[in-house]
Swiss-Prot record:
Motif annotated as NPA 1, chain positions: 142-144
Recorded family membership: Belongs to the MIP/aquaporin (TC 1.A.8) family. NIP (TC 1.A.8.12) subfamily.
Organism: Oryza sativa subsp. japonica
Gene Ontology cellular component annotations, sorted alphabetically: membrane
Chain's gene name: NIP3-1
Tissue-wise expression: Expressed in roots and leaves.
Keyword Repeat: yes
Keyword set includes Transport: yes
Positions of region (Disordered): 1-34
Primary subcellular site in the record, as a coarse category: membrane
The name this protein goes by in its record: Aquaporin NIP3-1
Subcellular location: Membrane
SUPFAM superfamilies for this protein: Aquaporin-like (SSF81338)
CDD domains in alphabetical order: MIP (cd00333)
Length: 311
């Protein structure tokens, strides 16, 4: 058995068929989600030697001209639940603080931030948190996302209560932090339906924008053919787009804790049920629709809990 050089070096090793790039993963192997480098981005600078698996000739020939080859497997790091919950708490706190601060600043300073600025602030916060904490907790930041992924077997149900609990706690802490910084202008950050729309319109607006968000998240987070390295940018762009459209009417929540934390701090619970139920239903629908329409793996692989954000 000979191990292929990572960048196609060595005549006897397995080399990539295109431009000397490192070999792809075994067919059907789930791509890392918001959790670090892919298996084909291996370098000599890694601190530990990855595991090497020999393939029979019939399989190896599909990947390399040699009769036998080795495929590098990098196992997902073992992160304790405590660390995951800590990262999820911090990520949710940061998201709620900055996504809510933008409309509060707008209220306090008479439109200092444009509607696009409000949307971009939330989108950039999401991108930043995914890139900084995704490799630890998966950067769910949203109970609707956690529940939807669990329903589709991309995340273990046993961890759902703990994730939702720290998301709620992070949201409430962010709400009171905002109250301390911006009092008495906190009402500008609470998402409530605009008086010009009906309850049904508000409900379906939140349903649709959350559907769109989870359709994108499920694509970049569970499909092996998606460009996982761009997950943070894609999800942040989806959040920005949704808030640009729904911000003037419902606030563009897409997230029960985006509404809950500021509502608790401000004591404003008007139509709160819309922001708890509509995003959750929209999330399950969006994730489910992408799962139904995506291309299937050739080996017919079924979803596994490890596919959800590699946690």
């Amino acid at each position: 058995m000979e191990m292929a050089a990572p960048n196609g070096g060595g005549a006897a090793g397995m080399s990539s068929p295109v431009n000397g790039a490192s070999a792809p993963a075994t067919p059907g192997t789930p791509a890392p989600l918001f959790a670090g480098p892919r298996v084909d981005s291996l370098s000599y600078e890694r601190k530990s030697m990855p595991r090497c698996k020999c393939l029979p000739a019939a399989v190896a020939e599909a990947w390399a001209p040699s009769a036998h080859g080795c495929v590098v497997e990098i196992p997902a790091p073992d992160v304790s639940l405590t660390r995951k919950l800590g990262a999820e708490f911090v990520g949710t706190f940061i998201l709620i603080f900055f996504a809510t601060a933008a409309p509060i600043v707008n209220q306090k300073y008479g439109g200092a931030i444009s509607p696009f600025g409000n949307a971009a602030c939330a989108g950039l916060a999401v991108t930043t948190i995914i890139l900084s904490t995704g490799h630890i907790s998966g950067a769910h930041l949203n109970p609707s996302l956690t529940i939807a992924f669990a329903a589709l077997r991309h995340f273990p149900w046993l961890q759902v209560p703990a994730y939702v609990a720290v998301q709620v706690l992070g949201s409430i802490c962010a709400g009171f932090a905002l109250k301390g910084v911006f009092h008495p202008f906190l009402s500008g950050g609470v998402t409530v339906p605009d008086p010009t729309i009906s309850t049904a319109q508000a409900f379906f607006t939140e349903f649709i924008i959350t559907f769109n968000l989870l359709f994108v998240v499920t694509a970049v987070a569970t499909d092996t053919r998606a460009v996982g390295e761009l997950a943070g940018i894609a999800v942040g762009a989806a959040v920005t787009l949704n808030i640009l459209i729904a911000g003037p009417t419902t606030g563009g929540s897409m997230n029960p804790v985006r509404t809950l934390g500021p509502a608790v701090a401000a004591g404003n619970y008007r139509q709160l049920w819309i922001y708890l139920i509509a995003p959750t239903l929209g999330a399950v629908a969006g994730a489910g629709v992408y799962t139904a329409v995506k291309l299937r793996d050739e080996n017919g692989e079924t979803p596994r809990p490890q596919r959800s954000f590699r946690r």
